[in-house]
């Protein structure tokens, strides 16, 4: 078999390019989180980048093999897809560059067509499927009692990761042991790696709990999140900067994530694309964040409109002059 490329959803496994054995399985035996191999089809007019297990991006070519995992994506601004939509042809797409595999069912007109692949088989070992959750080491599920700075958004691409980097950097500069985490969303290692670059001593996301995305049934997510929180707790951080994917109202289980860590959230940042979206979140959840950032705070006019519409403070975190005020707010929230 051609040596395959291992997408970043495989980083929790012991798979390597030299130990991949595949078998084609009947659809009744497929499930979320199964590691599968896809053969890249025509790349003309399609996205062709894959994020490797270490985070490096590569461009694949027609005929290359890629190892990823079956999953679901429900992005409001880019692509929607599900492995359950794969038909008898066995053709599917890379719904993210991290190797989240499924069939695209809806695509933004502003996004190039996702990578097109042909089902080559399930990754097998000792006549059993190799899966994401089956690759996890057993750990003790412990209580979680760590202060959390929670970042939520009105949608994807609302400024959450950029804001998270700023917060991680400020907290680490204060001498705190900071862990970065992404609790919900669709697999992509790049965002968490950027938290590490900003000063986080460790980074985790739902992939570390065996999920290709958090768009799974509620019971599965409620089982996976304590595993993720226990991983974080083992590092004994002073504070966790946690991103809750896109909007809590989207089917990524963001509302459940908020519920399960609610008692530990010391500061909540809402990233919004415009001031009116801030009001939408206030109305939907009947509660307000401590601060607004993202596109809704790009200019003085936007900040003033946020205040007028919602009564909330907003900061343009892309402007370094705002960081002193943010630091003051964080110190107060963490009682430093």
Question: Language-model features: where?
Answer:
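N-terminal accessory targeting/assembly segments
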Residues: 1-76, 81-91, 97
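C-terminal accessory "lid"/substrate-recognition subdomains
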Residues: 1-36, 188, 204-205, 210-212, ...
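Fold-independent oxyanion-binding glycine-rich loops
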Residues: 40-41, 69-71, 106-108, 153-155, ...
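Conserved catalytic-core segment of NTP-binding enzymes
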Residues: 77-78, 95-100, 105-133, 218-234, ...
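Walker A (P-loop) phosphate-binding motif
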Residues: 133-186, 297
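Short glycine/serine/threonine-rich phosphate/pyrophosphate-binding segments
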Residues: 160-166, 188-192, 248-253, 277-279
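N-terminal phosphate/diphosphate-binding loop that engages ATP/GTP or pyrophosphate donors
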Residues: 169-215, 283-287, 297-311
